[in-house]
UniProtKB/Swiss-Prot annotation:
Catalysed transformations (reactions): ATP + H2O = ADP + phosphate + H(+)
Annotated EC: 3.6.1.-
Coiled coil residues, start to end: none
Function text: Selects the target DNA sites for transposition. Recruits DDE-recombinase A to the target sites and catalytically activates it. Displays non-specific DNA-binding properties. Polymerizes as helical filaments around the DNA. Coating of the DNA by the target DNA activator B might play a role in favoring target-primed replication over integration. Prevents self-integration into an integrated copy of the viral genome.
Name assigned to this protein: ATP-dependent target DNA activator B
Organismal lineage: Viruses, Duplodnaviria, Heunggongvirae, Uroviricota, Caudoviricetes
DNA-binding residues: 21-40, 223-312
Induction trigger: Expressed in the early phase of the viral replicative cycle. Expression of early genes is repressed by viral Repc (latency) and favored by viral Ner protein.
GO-annotated cellular components: host cell cytoplasm
């Protein structure tokens, strides 16, 4: 591909609104000014270097475009269950807990809820942002408060002013990383601003506040929980909905997908496997079938015991 072809290819994509200079810059490592100048043949720097970088970007772009398009989002029975808890917390200005095993679709459901509703904010807690200051800072950034104070007191007051009157919903993903002090801070923020709050994560989110592990601090928060949703495993209806979205309806394929979805990682493993199987089948001009699914399980070297499935 020569420089003229690269310029023409990029110009076509931008003019057809398939991408933007900003997106190309972000993904290629070049500045928007450099890309614009290069496309218009006005770049005074090393055109050869820039052309090589943009050729690599173009090749990757077209390779991705040729892949079979996965379903953007599948509204499963579990998704509806999670959304019900989120709507309840929002409408009643209360706290809800959504807990469950990894890979059952909690995070994707929350992201879609945020995308399709106004005044919904979501942050994901990591060990490095599990303190009061770091957690509140994450929330401030999510709220667009890029110049928020960097001290706990002023930051908490700024967040209260920002959230008051919004009738919004704050979703805290991976909330099992949070200790009593941070949860108490979030509880007070929720109460004072009358927003909804959803704490989401593994079962430790809830078990910390109940049973033998319950401390005085956790017990105070527990008494404020209005709704708890526990998702222990993937429902058969969820797998069927995902299979339908991928246009997979053979009995053997459905049975295999159902068995895999019961393993640790559930829908996450299922989606990775479906994408790889779809890529392989697409390259051969065929539809996804049982053989492609089994091959995908093998190639992904999944950390699940599927040996009995593959022998059947």
């Amino acid at each position: 591909m020569n420089i003229s072809d690269i310029r023409a290819g990029l110009r076509t994509l931008v003019e057809n609104e398939e991408t933007t200079f900003k997106q190309i810059a972000l993904e290629s490592g070049l500045s928007t000014g450099t890309i614009s100048s290069f496309i218009n043949d006005k770049y005074n720097g090393d055109n050869e270097r820039v052309s090589q970088m943009l050729q690599r970007w173009l090749e990757k772009y077209h390779a991705v475009a040729e892949l079979p398009e996965p379903p953007r989002f599948v509204e499963t029975q579990t998704v509806k269950q999670i959304w019900t808890s989120m709507r309840f917390a929002s409408l009643t200005e209360s706290i809800a807990v959504v807990c469950g095993n990894p890979g059952v679709g909690k995070t994707e459901a929350a992201r879609e809820y945020r995308r399709t509703n106004n005044n919904v904010w979501m942050i994901t807690i990591t060990p490095s942002c599990a303190s009061v200051l770091e957690c509140l800072t994450e929330l401030a950034f999510e709220l667009g408060m890029n110049d928020a104070p960097r001290r706990k007191g002023p930051l908490s007051r700024a967040l209260r002013r920002r959230l008051e009157g919004t009738q919004g919903l704050v979703i805290i993903d991976e909330a099992d990383h949070l200790g009593a002090e941070v949860l108490e801070e979030l509880r007070l923020l929720q109460e004072s601003t009358r927003i909804g709050l959803v704490l989401m994560g593994n079962h430790r989110v809830y078990s910390n506040m109940t049973g033998g592990n319950r401390t005085v601090e956790f017990a105070r928060l527990f008494s404020r929980i209005a709704k708890r949703t526990a998702i222990n495993k993937t429902k058969k209806a969820d797998v069927k909905a995902i299979a339908d979205a991928w246009q997979i309806n053979g009995e053997k394929e459905l049975e295999l997908l159902q068995q895999i979805a019961q393993k640790p990682g559930a829908l996450r493993i299922l989606n990775h496997s479906l994408r790889l199987a779809a890529m392989t089948a697409h390259g051969k001009g065929e539809r996804v079938n049982e053989d492609y699914l089994r091959q995908a399980f093998r190639e992904l070297d999944l950390d699940v015991d599927i040996s009995t499935l593959l022998r059947n």
